[in-house]
From Swiss-Prot:
CDD domains: Hsp33
Lineage: Bacteria, Pseudomonadati, Pseudomonadota, Gammaproteobacteria, Pseudomonadales
Disulphide bridges: 235-237, 269-272
Primary gene name: hslO
Species assigned in the record: Pseudomonas syringae pv. tomato (strain ATCC BAA-871 / DC3000)
GO CC terms, sorted: cytoplasm
Protein name: 33 kDa chaperonin
Length: 300
């Protein structure tokens, strides 16, 4: 069964009789757009999809106005995975990899040994926050769950799956004691929902709609499912941002680059592959304080 809304989305749910909330995410279009920009090998595409699902879940969990950045680094076949998701639920992502070192069926520890995962919250107002954890789990789900074990008072667990076509995720998080105040009962309630979630197979997670998933896992528990929140792919690059980067070089260096590159500078967006061209006239106009016009020389 594959009866999802015709959008990418997150969807929150709560347990009426225990202090636990949950979030589900389903990505297809935004995942496909990221993969269309870069034809990644299957194991890399799967890891990137899982990280995209994680970012979407976290944006629904962390209350802030700005940008969430998940960045995984290693010295292995995949030195970089990066996903950005805004509080408006706009996603983009990228991976760097050494194709010669990629093997079919490779997992996180094969591709990113001795890796680390940085979670950065960059609010539009206020201080930037970053936390880092080792990528020491068997997969991204376990590694991200470990991050929250280290940094949060409340229990938080992730289940993430991707297959190159769809990316899905499930998050469970303890809430402050309200329904259940006895510590032992509270722990037992948490273990109950986590144990049941851990029975979900990759095939079920990738193919079943949210109502069916929750019924299979928690048909004996009162669960309330809320409305979906749309997610989309959107790159934040622009000609103006590229011009600002060029301006940071200074007039003399920018003019020299134009000469060295046969009359025009090309700035490429690493996320979406959009290209922005600047010639000598653009550079002169930029440093004269007039900004840069938006000509037809922006290319995909």
């Amino acid at each position: 069964m594959h009866d999802f809304p015709d959008i990418d989305f997150t969807q929150r749910f709560i347990f009426d009789e225990s202090d636990v909330r949950g979030e589900l995410v389903a990505l297809e279009r935004s995942y496909a757009e990221v993969l269309a920009k870069h034809p990644y090998p299957e194991p890399v595409a799967q890891l990137l999809g899982e990280l995209m699902a994680a970012a979407a879940l976290l944006v629904g969990t962390l209350k802030f106005d700005g940008l969430l950045i998940l960045q995984a680094r290693s010295s292995g076949a995949v030195p970089l995975l990066m996903v950005e998701c805004s509080s408006e639920r706009e996603l983009r992502g990228i991976a760097r990899y050494d194709e010669a070192l990629i093997t079919p069926g490779a997992g996180l520890q094969d591709l990113m040994p001795d890796g680390s995962l940085a979670l950065t919250v960059d609010p539009r107002q206020g201080k930037r926050y970053q936390g880092i954890v080792a990528l020491d789990g068997v997969d991204l789900s376990e590694s991200l769950s470990n991050y929250f074990v280290m940094s949060e008072q409340l229990g938080t667990r992730f289940w993430l799956k991707a297959d190159g076509h769809r990316a899905r995720g499930l998050l469970l998080q303890q809430l402050p004691a309200a329904q259940i105040t006895d510590p032992e009962e509270r722990d037992a309630s948490w273990e109950h929902v986590v144990t049941l979630a851990s029975t979900l197979t990759a095939e079920e997670m990738l193919s079943l709609d949210n109502q069916t998933v929750l019924h299979r896992l928690y048909h004996e528990d009162p669960v309330r499912l809320f409305d979906v929140q749309p997610i989309c792919f959107r790159c934040s690059c622009s000609r103006e941002r590229s011009a600002n980067a060029l301006a940071s070089l200074g007039l003399e260096d920018a003019q020299q680059l134009v000469i060295e590159h046969n009359g025009s500078i090309e700035i490429d967006c690493q996320f979406c592959n959009e290209r922005y061209l600047f010639d000598a006239t653009d550079v002169a106009q930029l440093f004269a304080g007039g900004g840069v016009d938006s000509p037809s020389d922006t290319r995909h």
